[in-house]
Amino acid sequence: MGIRIQELRKQFEDFTALAGIDLDIRQGELLALLGPSGSGKTTLLRIIAGLEHADAGRVLFGDEDATTMSVQARRVGFVFQHYALFKHMSVYENVAFGLRVRRGKARWPESQISARVFELLSLVQLDGLEQRYPMQLSGGQRQRVALARALAIEPRVLLLDEPFGALDAQVRRDLRRWLREIHDRTGLTTVFVTHDQEEALELADRVAILNQGGIEQVASPDEVYNRPSSPFVYSFVGAVNRLPGCVGADGLEVAGIVLSCPPQLSGWGAVDLYVRPEDLVLDAQEGWSAIVLWSQRSGPRMRVRARLEHSAHEVEIELSSATDEYVEGQKLRLIPRHYGVFFSESGS
């Protein structure tokens, strides 16, 4: 089931959490809501869940208007960062809880509940742990129980609010791969909130970048990283060098050299060029002359910081570890192979 967000607005006193957001979430996709603290991503997730109400706008589940629906009527599975498990209940009882609190005809017989619980414990790879209590589990295992409980009610949509934020780095990486596998097996429309760029780019089908209550870009991880639509996206997703320049009769000039001007850039004026460290490459003949300030190996890569000779600007370069060593004072020549250009605030 797809979800449509139409002109959603939410104000908390003087703070604008959502400023008229429009977003289409496709059926069966895994969408990441990525942004800094205060960008509106968690507020948007809570409004989709029915835990928060918008001041204006609509939330549609398929063709059904869910804006005023209760949490129960929406049939949403929700997973929080801090598990929200019942400490006094076993793993089995936690997973069964949502099914047991149903009333009337909606209530399943105990045999069906039991079958569903064991099916989900197998899905989340917790077979044999049904009688343990949350305090007897690791953080990663607790989050798996939380997901099984969210899936038990057969939700139409699965929502996750920074589900791996409380876990250490290695466990987060393992659970990311596992969650992707679970999603592919269930086919549920899934939305998750994160401030971790690596997590969003690795896990999601598409990423929605939020900033100050608005959406900057919605695109595939590859497009968000390689073709950002705004300076904010360039700066927020991944490392980037920013260099001032100008567009005039001679084309795009940055730090003393003329570069190819992107066709979508219309007009003349002051601009900023954005180039990622891995997109600055060594060239024997063309480009900027630069002086190495320092270099450092980082795993399979080498990071080099250099100052452009004809300007006061410094850049970071990321090179393959197979390249030579670089020492302070060494001269290089650099050329950007891929970059983005945007008019600066003072530009036309």
From Swiss-Prot:
CDD domains: ABC_CysA_sulfate_importer. GO terms for molecular function: ABC-type sulfate transporter activity; ABC-type thiosulfate transporter activity; ATP binding; ATP hydrolysis activity. It is a peripheral membrane protein. The keyword Electron transport does not apply. Coiled coil: none annotated. It is found in: Cell inner membrane. Keywords: ATP-binding, Cell inner membrane, Cell membrane, Membrane, Nucleotide-binding, Sulfate transport, Translocase, Transport. The complex is composed of two ATP-binding proteins (CysA), two transmembrane proteins (CysT and CysW) and a solute-binding protein (CysP). Part of the ABC transporter complex CysAWTP involved in sulfate/thiosulfate import. Responsible for energy coupling to the transport system. Belongs to the ABC transporter superfamily. Sulfate/tungstate importer (TC 3.A.1.6) family. This is Sulfate/thiosulfate import ATP-binding protein CysA.
